[in-house]
Amino acid sequence: MLLFTLCFFADLENGGKALASPPGKWQKADVRFDSSTAFKSLVVSPDKKTVENVGVPQVVPDNPERFSSSPCVLGSPGFRSGRHFFEVRYGTQREWAVGLAGKSVKRKGYLRLVPEELIWQRGLWFLQRLETDSDKLQKGSGKIVVFLDYSEGKVIFDQDGEVTTVQANFNGEEVVPFYYLGGGVSLTNL
């Protein structure tokens, strides 16, 4: 994997504005969707880089790793240390979220996408889309970058230049990429 030095880095204390000097190096993760965790209406591409919610339940084994009630899927690899980032391309569809989850995140039953459930995420929701400039939506897809600084307990989201930092307590647990996809949504790991 390549090491990248970021030109811009954001911090909540600075109002989400880019800082002039990056605080170190980050390792780009080659993230793949873990089809054994995918909710039954999610279809993972053969190369495991794209997932789509087709809205129709697929015939899949009901294994313990699979999300049973929420249209979610996890990615790999997982992280227990270091500074990592991954990028995800999204379309103009609504109802999606991208982030990180504790490896022990609840798989059976409905999830609340909150830190108390070991999920740190950002995305596009229906009400946000109604408030969004329609010209922006017509431009097509965008990109969200998720940064993890495990030792500092920080998850940083850069969604098309809008940066948010979330403080997290991982309690030594492995964290993995996390995705929520509403009906018709497709996401691609870059």
Curated annotation (Swiss-Prot):
Gene Ontology MF annotations:
toxin activity
Q: Which UniProt keywords apply?
A: Neurotoxin, Secreted, Signal, Toxin
S-S pairs: none
Endpoints of the signal sequence: 1-20
UniProt main location, coarse:
secreted
For the keyword Kinase, the answer is: no
* Pfam family, any one: PRY
Subcellular location as annotated: Secreted
Q: Which residues form the B30.2/SPRY domain?
A: 21-127
The entry's propeptide annotation covers 128-190
Per the record, what is one GO cellular component?
A: extracellular region
Q: Report which superkingdom the organism of origin falls in.
A: Eukaryota
Q: Which InterPro entries match?
A: B30.2/SPRY, B30.2/SPRY_sf, Butyrophylin_SPRY, ConA-like_dom_sf, PRY, SPRY_dom, TRIM/RBCC
**Found in which tissues?**
Expressed by the venom gland.
PROSITE patterns linked:
B302_SPRY
Per the similarity annotation, which family is this? Answer: Belongs to the ohanin/vespryn family.
Q: What does this protein do?
A: Neurotoxin that produces dose-dependent hypolocomotion and hyperalgesia in mice. May directly act on the central nervous system, as it is 6500-fold more potent when administered intracerebroventricularly than intraperitoneal.
* Protein name as it appears in the record: Vespryn-21
Source species: Drysdalia coronoides (White-lipped snake)
